[in-house]
Amino acid sequence: MILLIRKRTLLYTWLAVCMIGLSAIFLAGSRRAFTPTGAMGQGSRVQTVVIDPGHGGQDGGAVAGDGTEESRINLAISLQLEQFLRFAGVRTELTRREDVMVCDPGLETMRQRKVSDLHNRASFVNDVPNAVLLSIHQNSLPSSPVTHGAQTFWNRQEGAEALARTLQAGLNPVVNTHRAKEPKPIPDSIYLMNHVDAPAVLVECGFLSNREEAARLQQADYQKTLAAVIAAGYLRWMAGEDRK
């Protein structure tokens, strides 16, 4: 079973990388600028993908049974995602490149640091012209250790729902092989997603509360597969294949 999963993972990585390569060739030969699906009235301004590795530093996020923190997995996937997107010619920015909080210095309490962290991430995204936000996270549901799979959530900005659905369509055959998941609107309680002006999608790549999935999420090859699928989905959305 493990060998089958690894073979399937490698296959989908290869397919996603091929799609990224073809998209890079197509976009390199095209004179049109990178513009978000749905147009959003942005004209020909070049689009920048802001990749947000959730949590970081003292805020480790969800924790797997073996003690592995979500923040490190988020960063690993995000750095791979950046490489794939840059290979395709897409401009990128990251909210963090190390396992640190993005908060102001000198704050005394964890609550203060978390609030500052979220405010700074939102400001970072809003300062990037013509941005699209991809926020990378891991899920956890200790009360149901069998729950697994990847799911996307979109904010209220134009184009976000179409992007979330495109990403979910790519993730389902790779991660949710037993039961496909549906993308959903982001809850009002998620500060960052509701305080950015850009179309934004939060990607929950898997459940750290599921022992088998947590083990896969820590594997470099699986992280690369997730990044490749997300990158391929973004390129498909940007090319206008899933505008509706």
Regions found by a protein language model. Give the residues of each.
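Catalytic-site microenvironment of enzymes
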Residues: M1-K244
